[in-house]
Design a protein with these regions (language model features):
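Eukaryotic intrinsically disordered and solvent-exposed regulatory patches
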Residues: 18
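A structural signal for leucine-rich repeat
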Residues: 92, 114-115, 138-140, 163, ...
């Protein structure tokens, strides 16, 4: 390498906290790093048993994959607004993590970021943050999470993003959301749905076994309703579809529910072919 400074993602090596350096902080309950650090490398603090709180400097830009995975004492993760990137699984499997505060400049919540954080109760985003995507399994099995207000710029909620979040009763979906992925809200506690008009794709089993839902009205720009979207929603009485999507998959509801639509529409034909009870709109 000669005298050339080593870099990772445009960051000098001397400004990266790696696993070897992290060992110097192994017994700290409050992690406060020197201000010059701009990145924490993959797995740097993984399996730490002491850290309870993070106090990261205002030059920190990136947290690597699994950087704080399975930090069993971690209770609060507060990211400075300088953080732009999180690695996959960065806060996964933290059994005592209760609160997480996201950075203003964060671009996305990566895959498995908070997966199986079973005591997570609060996830806060700044009003105008740049997050456009919630990754696969990002909050999967966060069983204590009661509500979430998604950032205004989110376009996609990827597969299993909130899988089996059993206490999740309220979600504010942003106008501009385009896709809700496969099993994104599988077996959640949602009591009602207000989906934005921008929504185009409801992927397979998106709201499977959301047993508290009783009535849902779909926005009129949805192009694809994949199979089993509301199947297993045992209390669902009515699914209202006021337009003709390009595609409707099989068994989108239970037989006990009914579909409210316009007489003679493609949705009406789908119901007749599938044996679903129909209620006609005036």
């Amino acid at each position: 390498m000669g005298n050339r400074t080593q870099q990772i993602a445009g960051i000098d090596k001397k400004d990266i906290m790696n696993r070897r350096l992290a060992d110097n902080y192994w017994k700290k309950e409050e992690l406060k790093l020197p201000d010059h650090y701009r990145m924490i490398s993959a797995g740097a603090f993984q399996d730490n048993i002491r850290i309870e709180r993070l106090l990261l400097g205002n030059r920190m830009e990136a947290l690597g994959k699994d950087s704080f995975r399975h930090c069993i004492a971690l209770r609060e993760a507060r990211l400075p607004h300088s953080v732009e990137r999180l690695g996959e699984g960065c806060f996964a499997d933290c059994p005592r993590l209760r609160e997480a505060y996201m950075s203003q400049n964060l671009q996305a919540i990566p895959n498995s970021a908070f997966r199986e954080d079973r005591r997570l109760e609060k996830i806060l985003f700044t009003r105008d943050c740049d997050i456009f995507r919630i990754g696969k399994d990002a909050f999967s099995e966060c069983v204590k999470l009661p509500a979430i207000l998604l950032p205004r710029k989110v376009k996609e909620i990827d597969d299993r993003a909130f899988y089996r979040c059993k206490e999740l009763k309220r979600v504010r979906f942003p106008e501009g959301l385009i896709r809700i992925g496969k099993e994104a809200f599988y077996f959640c506690g949602l009591e009602s749905l207000e989906l934005p008009e921008s929504l185009e794709i409801l992927d397979e089993k998106a709201f499977f076994k959301c047993t508290q839902l009783t009535e849902v009205c779909l926005p009129t720009h949805i192009r694809r309703i994949e199979k089993w979207v509301f199947h297993g929603c045992s209390r669902l009485k009515v699914l209202e579809i006021r337009h003709d999507p390009e595609y409707i998959g099989e068994w989108i509801i239970n037989k006990a529910a009914r579909i409210r639509c316009y007489r003679g529409s493609k949705v009406d034909m789908y119901c007749q072919e599938s044996g679903f009870t129909v209620e006609y709109l005036e």
